[in-house]
Structure formats: structure tokens, C-alpha cells
Regions:
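Conserved beta-strand in the GNAT
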Residues: 57, 63-72
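Conserved GNAT-fold acetyl-CoA-binding loop/helix
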Residues: 19-44
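A short beta-loop-alpha structural element at the N-terminal edge
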Residues: 6-18
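Conserved acetyl-CoA pyrophosphate-binding loop and the N-cap/start of the following alpha-helix
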Residues: 94-106
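Conserved GNAT acetyl-CoA-binding A-motif
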Residues: 111-120
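A short helix-loop-beta-strand connector motif used in the catalytic cores of GNAT acetyltransferases and
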Residues: 44-57, 84
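A conserved beta-turn-beta hairpin within the catalytic core of GNAT-like acetyltransferases
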Residues: 73-85, 95, 113, 138-139
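Conserved active-site alpha-helix within GNAT-family acetyltransferase domains
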Residues: 101, 121-140, 146
């Protein structure tokens, strides 16, 4: 990783930049219409007294180049905590400099458990990138989602 790359934990002053990065990621993933985040609510979840998630910021020469938004998980089979990587994004003009790799490594350094994430099945550049790091898809697993605006069974 070039010496101009710096990783750091996000602070409340990063909120606008985090929201911009999320929108840029959503645009890249062709899901911009799905983004309904409210910055004030997001601030509470990231920087409140009991944060739901954390953000690692990546700067390249003092400019925000990307981020990883993640939160702790727990594996009952391993009997230890891990990390779920919700979002990883490096701005196009900063790609190819080792920033994504540095962000992933920073998460692996935070846990001796699993680091897990999803990737869209059409996103071959990301699939290739994750494969180059030694990560592999989980055969036999399907991701499910229940959203609060859908009726719950029973």
C-alpha cells in the first residue's frame, strides 16, 4: 500500500462523506433508487452511545478514497466473534492502489473469526478482487431478507 494511503476510524465529521460514498456505491451497484438513508438517523447508528455499525475510512493523500462499513457478528459454530462487511467501496480514481485490500486486511486484523460479506452475482470485478485475496463463495447458502415494511408471519 502506498505511503499516501491512511486508514482510520470514522468520526462524526465524516458523516456527509460516508453518505456520499454509500450513494456512489449504490449507483455503481445500480441500486441508487433503494437508498433512503437519513443522515441524522445514520449518525445515531454510527456514532451514538451504542453504535450499530462502524466505518473505516481510507484516505489517499488526504482525500477520502473509500470506506468499509462493518459490524460485529458471532459464530456459534466457531464460538467466537467475527465481522460482517456491509459495504466496501473505493472511488474509481483511487482503485488499483491497494486501498480495497488494505480495508479488508484492517478488518481481518480486528478479529480472529470470520469476515463475511455479500457480492452481487453480476459484479465480476469485485468477485475477481475478493478471489485474489483468497476469499471464496459459500456453497449451499442462500441469503434471506425480511424488511420491516413486509408482514411478518403469524
Amino acid at each position: 500500500v502506498p505511503s499516501t494511503i491512511e486508514l482510520r476510524d470514522a468520526v462524526p465529521d465524516d458523516l456527509d462523506e460516508i453518505c456520499s460514498l454509500i450513494r456512489e456505491l449504490a449507483e455503481y451497484e445500480r441500486m441508487l433508487d433503494d437508498v433512503v438513508l437519513a443522515p441524522a438517523v445514520m449518525a445515531g447508528h454510527l456514532f451514538g452511545p451504542d453504535p450499530s455499525a462502524r466505518v473505516t475510512m481510507a484516505e489517499d493523500g488526504g482525500t477520502v478514497a473509500g470506506f468499509a462499513l462493518w459490524f460485529p457478528t458471532f459464530s456459534t459454530f466457531l464460538g467466537r466473534p467475527g465481522i460482517w462487511l456491509e459495504d466496501l467501496f473505493v472511488r474509481p480514481e483511487h482503485r488499483g492502489r491497494g486501498i480495497g485490500q488494505a480495508l479488508i486486511r484492517s478488518l481481518r486484523a480486528r478479529t480472529d473469526g470470520r469476515v463475511e460479506w455479500n457480492v452481487l452475482d453480476w459484479n465480476q470485478p469485485s468477485i475477481d478482487f475478493y478471489g485474489s485475496l483468497g476469499a471464496r463463495p459459500l456453497p449451499g447458502w442462500i441469503t434471506y431478507r425480511w424488511t420491516p415494511d413486509e408482514s411478518a408471519p403469524g
